[in-house]
């Protein structure tokens, strides 16, 4: 086995990575909703059921947390808990994304800063081929490691 194996693996990994990046850019979906508790939101074949919203006070921040369940074709796939955090020192607002990982895609929800008391703005995303993207990255790393381990310096000539 020569060091070419590692190089081939790394290059194949880069090809897989690029294919996943392009496929993700073409096939990803996003939709923004102004939602109220009890709303059922749809993106592609996924149904997002907006269950509840809570305000929490922690030691160093206050937050607004939403609870949504995800289903597809009647099958429950999990629960999202996106969150907006308000830090006082220094004054900062952050958005905590909630993700459900699946084999061929990631589905995630981002909550925007509320503009009124009536509804909350939610961004729903479907990002396909994310695991394939990470497979490409792992192949690049392993290819580099294999190449380094199998590398032999040329012997000096007499």
What are these regions (language model features)?
Residues 1-153, 157:
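Solvent-exposed, non-transmembrane regions of integral membrane proteins
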